[in-house]
């Protein structure tokens, strides 16, 4: 099944959570923080401005992005976890 976002929405595959601390201690599942970055796997067609003009997406598939802690909606498709969020929820592109 393929996910195809609509309008100005983006589908992000979150990076895996850290398993160990820098000192080598294993972090239990309850202590893991959700990562705030991931890779874009799909983008919508863009946002329609008030004038009716279609504004292209600045985010492209394959880019690594930084987003807010509470951004997006979590979905699971065929055992894989994704976030669906608006392009405006993305803070930066990571190089």
Curated annotation (Swiss-Prot):
PROSITE patterns: CHAPERONINS_CPN10. It holds the Pfam family Cpn10. It comes from the Bacteria. GO terms for biological process: chaperone cofactor-dependent protein refolding. Its main location: cytoplasm. It is found in: Cytoplasm. One of its GO terms (cellular component) is cytoplasm. One of its GO terms (molecular function) is unfolded protein binding. Keywords: Chaperone, Cytoplasm. HAMAP family: CH10. Heptamer of 7 subunits arranged in a ring. Interacts with the chaperonin GroEL. Together with the chaperonin GroEL, plays an essential role in assisting protein folding. The GroEL-GroES system forms a nano-cage that allows encapsulation of the non-native substrate proteins and provides a physical environment optimized to promote and accelerate protein folding. GroES binds to the apical surface of the GroEL ring, thereby capping the opening of the GroEL channel. Belongs to the GroES chaperonin family. This is Co-chaperonin GroES. It comes from Chlorobium phaeobacteroides (strain DSM 266 / SMG 266 / 2430).
